[in-house]
Amino acid sequence: MKNKKWMINLAISNLLLVFLGVGLVIPVLPPLKEQMHFSGTTMGMMISIFAIAQLIASPAAGYLSDKVGRKKLIALGMIIFSFSELLFGLAQVKAVFYISRALGGIAAALLMPSVTAYVADLTTLAERAKAMGKVSAAISGGFIIGPGVGGFIAKFGIRVPFYVAALLAFVGFILSMTVLKESEKTMDINPEATQSSFLDILKNPMFTSLFVVILISSFGLQAFESIYSIMATINFGFTMSEIALIITVSGILALFFQLFLFDWIVEKIGELHLIHLTFFASALFIAVIAFTGNRITVALSTFVIFLAFDLFRPAVTTYLSKHAGDQQGAINGLNSTFTSFGNILGPLAAGMMFDINHFFPYYISAIILFGTGILSMLMTRKRKQANF
């Protein structure tokens, strides 16, 4: 039992190291933009390239984790991420920055399904929610700790955080190769089964309906989240330090819930009801922000919205992992694909809506999330009828 917990924590720690590395570089992106004389379009391209690479690579990565093993994919993801951060730190031209971001997206595609599947392999259904809460907490923790540490490290040079991120990922690679043990449930699938495996998953209406919900909800979440800082500044006059405080408090709140309360909530109401609750809560409080002029109300509503977002993701992952059977990698790979697709479209749509009217992203996000909540409830009824 202790050995199993150690292996789970080691796998999850890789995600912590990666997202700590991602968080480290956040404070230095604005000065790097100025140093390299990059346009906003160039910086946006770097974000999009990462997401597109992750989108394209996720299905294959999920299948490969079932075929060749979680450990190999986790280790490969860590070394690719390490190289991508090192390359970004050394880059002097746009093309190299773009290549670095593409490699980072591929690394994320390799890591997310593999770590999630690894954790699912080593946990019982009763243990699953708590373990998936830890997976999400590792991501949240990296984003919370990273920017503060990155701001301090950047005093030694604005590219130093990239080198530190590369080093952290390399440490994770070494630990994965030398200490992490392969899970016993890894499948050995013949090549002919690859296509039929994905087709079987996508032909299953219960999985497909949930993937549609994931896609639509990711679009709505990112339409709000991606330009929150800009909207808060222009619409309500928040300073950057105030926005940073709101986001930090939101992250700490999410971390607490993911680590200590997520499994209790799932035990009480179940993953599907939690998913419904997060949709309706986020839609309601986004609408509150859209129609209030009170800054305190905006801040408190933001806490609820970001908490709902951070409970939705592990709830979906937990539910999928409980029904994935021997296709943990493939299912989680498709989950990452549909999430990435929504993450790409959401910010683009939000930016265009913001140019038309500064409050349009609020209205559209609230409508989409409320509609997705209704859709997910209807689909839940069908799942119950199908005993899924």
Predicted regions and their residues:
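C-terminal transmembrane helical hairpin of 12-TM major facilitator-type secondary transporters
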Residues: 272-316
